[in-house]
């Protein structure tokens, strides 16, 4: 491995909508944008590769199965004030998947991007 950047690929239905979501609501910056096929956005050392149906990542597998958005894997963003983030994002119309879950390590909630990919917001217990 040659660098400290963490790259995560999300399959999305609409590249432009995904770029708008991640830059407007979650503080990502655009690295490149070539809709409808692809864009990548970054936040710190996290780089999201947003691949639309027209991208190489959206091509059918050898068995004919087509990759699609969604699922339960997700990026995990840490916040110092989960309640404030939830209120801000709700006011912006961002859809949430669940209510806050509290565990021994902290509190978490899941929100969805325009294609149904999950983003976990997490506040460690010591905050």
Where are these regions (language model features)?
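Vicinal oxygen chelate
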Residues: 1-7, 29-78, 86-112, 123-127
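Short glycine-/small-residue motifs
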Residues: 118-121
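Catalytic core of Fe(II)/2-oxoglutarate
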Residues: 11
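Conserved active-site tyrosine of GNAT-family acetyltransferases
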Residues: 18, 22-25, 89, 116
